[in-house]
């Protein structure tokens, strides 16, 4: 795009960005002064969110936290908005048998990897209430929802992109911000997904293995080294996934889809018969396809002992 045209477009978005900022501040203030009612709960709620749009790796952290507390004997439940799913009315309890087209990819992925109840509702406060009423839980983790102030919370965790940070520092739609950077001063923990800054905790996303989408067969990280493969990603920042595959020595052809994209089998039909590599988030939308050349990269979030110790103390 011509730089002058881009500059004009950016300049025209500045007032909208300013309005978004004012609305964000005013809306939060209305909850602070109790103009809007905050829904409180009898069990602690941990929110894992961010102040920017786009993927920052929240879901692997939610899964890691859920598994950590589950191992401690907690009865954990998760709530989510259910982005990309067709379910829009009321709450839906997601389990491993739920249709991904109803739930969206992230809630189903969390349910599959944790074997814990996941309740989706665009009203997260209602999701928490229904989760408590329908399931035996004593700790709730909210996948995203930092800006859903109607839902009371005991711990706020913000995940930030350690490379992109806060982009150009502007609010939507001119920049990536949903809330001011100063919001970080009021949260309990900031987790950096790439690198480390003062006052932030690091998380290590560890590549584990490749798993066949159809058969569950497992292969080591070196299995596709030197081979030609198709890389498929419908996530917030696909370049991270592609770069990880390239670092494994894979000759990769990139195929980028929109975040939360619902795949059709025709999307994954290529002229050659090279393996198709995808994320776990993409995998849950492709299990019904008749293609044994699809593999997903299993990734785990490793949270620091220092972070977990301080989180336990907060609860």
Curated annotation (Swiss-Prot):
UniProt entry tagged with the keyword Oxidoreductase: no
Annotated binding of ATP, by residue: 52-59
Catalysed reaction, written as an equation: a lipid A disaccharide + ATP = a lipid IVA + ADP + H(+)
Keywords: ATP-binding, Kinase, Lipid A biosynthesis, Lipid biosynthesis, Lipid metabolism, Nucleotide-binding, Transferase
Any GO MF annotation of the entry: ATP binding
Pfam families referenced in this protein's UniProt entry, alphabetically: LpxK
GO biological process: lipid A biosynthetic process; lipopolysaccharide core region biosynthetic process
InterPro entries linked: LpxK, P-loop_NTPase
Database matches in SUPFAM superfamilies: P-loop containing nucleoside triphosphate hydrolases
Record-listed E.C. numbers: 2.7.1.130
Gene Ontology cellular component list: plasma membrane
Pathway: Glycolipid biosynthesis; lipid IV(A) biosynthesis; lipid IV(A) from (3R)-3-hydroxytetradecanoyl-[acyl-carrier-protein] and UDP-N-acetyl-alpha-D-glucosamine: step 6/6
Top class in the EC scheme: transferase
HAMAP family in UniProt: LpxK
UniProt xrefs under NCBIfam families: lpxK
Protein name according to UniProt: Tetraacyldisaccharide 4'-kinase
Organism: Ruthia magnifica subsp. Calyptogena magnifica
């Amino acid at each position: 795009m011509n730089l002058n045209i881009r500059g004009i477009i950016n300049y025209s978005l500045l007032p909208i960005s300013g309005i978004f900022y004012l609305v964000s501040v005013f809306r939060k203030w209305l909850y602070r002064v109790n103009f809007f009612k905050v829904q409180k709960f009898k069990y602690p709620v941990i929110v894992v969110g961010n102040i920017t749009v786009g993927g920052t790796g929240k879901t692997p952290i939610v899964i890691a936290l859920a598994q950590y507390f589950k191992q401690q004997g907690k009865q954990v439940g998760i709530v989510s908005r259910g982005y990309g799913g067709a379910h829009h009315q009321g709450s839906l309890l997601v389990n491993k048998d739920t249709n991904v087209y109803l739930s969206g990819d992230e809630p189903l992925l969390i349910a599959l990897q944790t074997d814990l109840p996941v309740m989706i509702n665009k009203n997260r406060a209602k999701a928490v209430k229904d989760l408590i009423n329908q399931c035996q839980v004593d700790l709730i983790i909210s996948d995203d929802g930092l800006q859903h102030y109607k839902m009371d919370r005991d711990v706020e965790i913000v995940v930030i992109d350690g490379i992109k940070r806060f982009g150009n520092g502007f609010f939507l739609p001119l920049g990536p911000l949903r809330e001011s950077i100063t919001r970080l001063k009021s949260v309990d923990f900031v987790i950096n997904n790439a690198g480390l800054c003062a006052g932030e905790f690091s998380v290590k996303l560890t590549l584990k293995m490749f798993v066949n989408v159809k058969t569950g067969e497992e292969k080591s990280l070196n299995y596709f080294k030197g081979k030609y493969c198709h890389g498929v990603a419908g996530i917030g920042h696909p370049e991270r996934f592609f770069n990880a595959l390239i670092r494994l020595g894979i000759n990769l052809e990139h195929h980028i889809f929109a975040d939360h994209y619902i795949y059709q089998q025709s999307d994954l039909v290529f002229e050659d018969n090279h393996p198709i590599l995808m994320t776990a988030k993409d995998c849950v939308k492709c299990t019904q396809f008749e293609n044994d050349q699809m593999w997903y990269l299993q990734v785990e979030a490793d949270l620091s002992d220092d972070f977990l110790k301080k989180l336990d103390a907060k609860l």
